[in-house]
Structure formats: structure tokens, C-alpha cells
Amino acid sequence: MTFEEREAQRAEADSWTAYASKAKGGPAEVTADNGFAALGLPTLLVERLARDGIAEPFPIQAATIPDALAGRDVLGRGRTGSGKTLAFGLPTITRLGDGTKRESKRPRALVLVPTRELAMQVSDALEPLVHVSGLRHKLVAGGLSYDKQIDALAKGIDLLVATPGRLVDLMDRGAVHLDKVEITILDEADHMADMGFVEEMTSILDAIPEGGQRLLFSATLDRGVDTLVEKYMTDPVTHSTDDAQAAVTTMSHHVLLIDPQDKKAVTSEVANRQGPTIVFARTQLGTDRIARELRERGVLAASLHGGLSQAVRNRVLGAFREGRIPVLVATDVAARGIHVDDVGLVLQVDPPRDHKDYLHRSGRTARAGESGAVVTLALPHQKRMMERLLEQAGVDTAPVRVKPGDANVLATGGSAPSGQPIPEEQFRPLIEAAPRGRQGRRTPGGSRGEHHRRGDRRGPRPGGRPSGRRAQWEGER
């Protein structure tokens, strides 16, 4: 057995959905006040959710599911972590359960997402529901085996979860045809547009017959998303709940003005805290450098970015989810695949580009009804820029000058680190350790304790990759 096969086997065995979808026993008791039953969902899906203690829908789910069940086009405005996966997954699975025979290479429903990590999490979240409904689904994304994806498509599936680049690859190869797609979901459409995938999204939507149902979920409607809505959606009903700008009121915000020579010390003091923390850096090299500097000061941190192999990324994410690594230093793109409900603090080592990026980064904390904190480090000459950005983001806080050890630094929940470097021989085993087989935390949101599966490296696309901005996202497709 190859290394890749062993990894895939182990990851599947450890996935909570692999356990849950095969769990035996009678139906769970559905109480009279079950919120999902009131939405008109089939009993088997309501019982499957109840078995995992999921009985009350999130606002985005309660708002969109009835319209989606009725076949309406739906435009959902909600931030990451608001429960969108079940909002589109439950009605889609319900509508697919009409007994229509599946055909080779022709899925009946498509979920399009920006990154492979998000694709994995969507697939894992829907797996028990697909299983109990007697349907088949498949995940196709870069970094996973072409052969397994092509074989599954040839056998016939009902629901396809895909990233834009890999799906276009498979369409070019003749491995999948979209002429039988009845339901199309675009999840985090604004992120796909921001990553340069508008051309791919357009090609995919053009290959799907008119008249089908389309569900689009996006935090914003700029960057080309409004054009997609106008061109491909028919009289969509719009639901806007738990938007990113409103959510900032559930967080505490700190903008710390620091001198350049104090940046490393303040970064380590803020990051040295209890609970999961995500640190944002602008570049791949920056994430590696900051994670290394934190470990040199005694803060256990690992970096995550598109320059790492898929195997390493999966292990780093697993270590972060399981608490073996409490601090994750990530680029904006890599962080879009992180869906962990209990992140207590987001630290921006450099100010974001604009208020929208501030909101997207902030959305990694204060999820699923929890509280959280957002800390931004800025140099004195960036004060006015930060004040404008905060105003645009709807954040009521003022930048303050600080030095290492100041009360305003410690007020973020941090503390002075030990100063004892964490040696490589202590750090590396925490990343390489096998993930613990456990059920993840479950809340009525879009991702409930999902674990990643390991796949092979992505194969080449016929004719090579396009040059320009889209090429830089090769590892994310």
C-alpha cells in the first residue's frame, strides 16, 4: 500500500462523517418543536440531523430552505460560518430524492466552491445526509486523484462538489457533462470572483441548461458577482442574514500602533494566549517567517499557505483543529478553507488592503454565536488609513499607541511568552501526529467538526495553465 493510500484510508477512518454515516440504530426522536421539521424537510433528514443533536436551524437556514424547497432561485447574503452549507444542502438533497435514475458522467446537482479545503468540508458536512437519502456524491478538486474522480463520475453521481479549475479540467477531458444539472449552487461566490475565477464560473454556468434552479451565496455582490446574478438567475428571492458588517458588533476590536522594532515582541504577546488563534500575513514567505519567529519566542505556531504540499496542509489544519498547534499563521487565500467555530482571536500582523478584507478576516472568529477578538497591528504612519478603514467596516474603535507589555496589549487576552525557543524536534511531531479519531464539535452551521481527506497531487491540465492572475491560484483550484 502506498503512502497516499494509507493516508486516504486513515483520514477516512478518522472522519466523523465516515462514522456517522455508517452508524447503526433506530431513528432519533424528533420533538414537536424541531425547527428543521417545521421547514418542511423530509423526516429521514430531520431524524439524521437530530441524531447529531441538530434541531434548531440558523437564521440563514430558516430563511432560505423553504424557498429553495419550492424551486425558487435564491440569493443568500451571509458571512462564512453562518450555516450556509445546510441552507443549500438540505433542500438540494431533498429535491434530488425524486427517484430519477442517475446517468454516467452527468450529475444532477452541482456545488461550486472556491478552494479544495472548503470543498472537502462541504462534502464532509453533506455526506451523512446524502448517505441516508440513498444518493451518491463526489468531491472533485485540485490536489486529489484524477483517476478516482473520473471513475466515480463514470459510475454516475447525483451531487457534485467541485472547485472551478478542476471542474473545467474534467469538462475539457470529457469526464463530466453538465447538461443534466438541475440545481446549481455557488458558495462564497465573492471569494471565487476575488480569486480570478469569473471566467471559469461563466464557462461552467454556460454549460448548464437554462431553467434549472440556482442558489448563490455570497457575503458581497461586487467583483463581478452582480453580473453573474443578473445573467444566470431568474427572479431570485434574496435573504440577507448575519452579514459580515453586522457581525463585527459581536467582536472586540483592537488597533495597536507600534514602532517597527516592537513588532515581533507585540506579535508574540498577542498570540501567546489560550485557545485557537489565527494570524494573518500578506505573503507565503511572511507566514513562514512569522511562525518561525513565534516559535523562537516560545509560542507554538505553524504556517499555512498555498506553497505547501496538500499533505502538509492537511496535517497542519488537523493539528490546528485538534489543538496540538494553537496558533495558525495563514495567508488570506489559505484561511478561506479554515472553518473552525472556536477561534477566539484573529491577529492581523499587517493592516488588510481594505475594509472588505478586514471583514473577511474578522469572520474567522465570533462564529456560531461565540464571541471573539480582532487585533490589528499598524505603524504610526498608517493611523489615518486604519481610521478610514474602520469607519468603512462599521467598527467603533480607535487606534492606540503601545509598547511591549503595555496594558492595552495584554487586554487582548495575550501574555508575555516564555522566550524559550521551541525546537524543531518538538514542533515537527505535533504536525506529523496521526489525527485523533473523534467526532467534531457539532453546531447547526455549515461545517460541524469536519476532517480533511488526503488526496494525490493534482495532475496537469491539458494545454497548460493560463498565465496572469488566475495562475497564482493554481494550488487553490
Q: Over which residues does each language-model region extend?
A:
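Pre-Walker A (Motif I) flank of P-loop NTPase domains
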Residues: 70-76, 106-109, 158, 274-276, ...
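The conserved Walker
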Residues: 78-82
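Arginine-glycine-biased low-complexity disordered regions
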Residues: 4, 28, 296, 322, ...
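Walker B catalytic acidic pair
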Residues: 164, 180, 188, 331, ...
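Conserved nucleic-acid-binding Ia/Ib motif block in the N-terminal RecA-like helicase ATPase lobe
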Residues: 47, 54, 102-172, 180-183, ...
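Interdomain coupling/hinge region of P-loop NTPase helicase/AAA+ cores
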Residues: 110, 129, 137-140, 149, ...
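Walker A/P-loop NTP-binding motif
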Residues: 62-74, 85-103, 120, 125-129
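N-terminal intrinsically disordered, low-complexity tails of helicases
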Residues: 1-63, 477
